[in-house]
A protein has these predicted regions:
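Predominantly the C-terminal beta-signal and adjacent terminal strand-loop region
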Residues: 82-84, 138, 148, 154-197
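Outer-membrane beta-barrel porins/channels
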Residues: 108, 112-114, 133-137, 141-143, ...
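Cleavable N-terminal export/targeting peptides
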Residues: 1-29
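A short beta-strand motif that forms part of the nucleic acid-binding face
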Residues: 120, 144, 168
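Short, aromatic- and cysteine-enriched interfacial helices/patches
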Residues: 24-30, 48-50, 170, 179
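Gram-negative (and chloroplast) outer-membrane scaffold detector with strong preference
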Residues: 23-30, 34-43, 59-133, 154, ...
Length: 197
């Protein structure tokens, strides 16, 4: 009897394992598009004598391919807004560019999905401003910027969903503020709509 119970338990475990594996390797290849609007906040450190406003409206658009129910790939364009600085130097610092990401998802229910993402992004940071009343000076820096994020999605229909995301973009710009763009992490909180074909 004990042997039969053990055999039944092993068979049940193998069935669950096979079912999970089938879900992971069951390709869906479903394309989708989306757009989000939110607020970006930079942690840039301003030198003495300069005051910085580090928050601004930000937005992004993207297209993706759902590989299976757990993994998707995304490519998009993002505008992380601008920081403004005043004092002995005055002007703006803005960051935008192309984004790529691998997105992992887990469905709590057919309507509610949790997500986590890791991205490699190609972002350009530009500073336009003046120093002590001199003529406008422009400085730019384009880098590979890594990002991480988490989010949630609520599906209104099988095709339309509402998405909330938090993302952090690490070390945008260059490390030197004077004569450069300054280096900063940028946090983005956004809400948007996604449409699945």
């Amino acid at each position: 009897m004990r042997t039969m119970h053990l055999a039944a338990a092993v068979a049940s475990a193998l069935t669950l394992s096979t079912s999970a594996s089938a879900g992971f390797f069951d390709l869906t290849l479903a394309p989708y598009v989306g757009g989000s609007l939110g607020q970006a906040t930079s942690d840039i450190s301003c030198p003495v004598g300069i005051s910085c406003d580090d928050s601004d409206t930000a937005w992004k658009i993207y297209g993706g391919l759902e590989i299976n129910e757990y993994i998707s790939m995304e490519v998009g364009y993002i505008d992380l807004g601008e920081s403004t600085f005043t004092g002995t130097q005055s002007g703006t610092r803005e960051t935008n560019g192309m984004t790529t990401a691998v997105v992992g998802t887990y469905a709590i229910s057919p309507s509610f999905i949790l997500s986590g993402r890791g991205g490699m992004n190609f972002l350009n940071t530009e500073v336009n401003g003046t120093i002590a009343g001199t003529s406008t000076q422009n400085t730019g820096d384009t880098d590979v910027v890594w990002s991480f994020g988490v989010g949630a999605q609520y599906n209104l229909t099988p095709a339309v969903g509402l998405r909330l995301d938090w993302e952090r973009f690490f070390e945008t710009g260059s490390s030197n503020f004077n004569g450069g763009t300054g280096e900063a992490d940028i946090d983005l909180f956004s809400a948007g709509v996604v449409y699945k074909f």
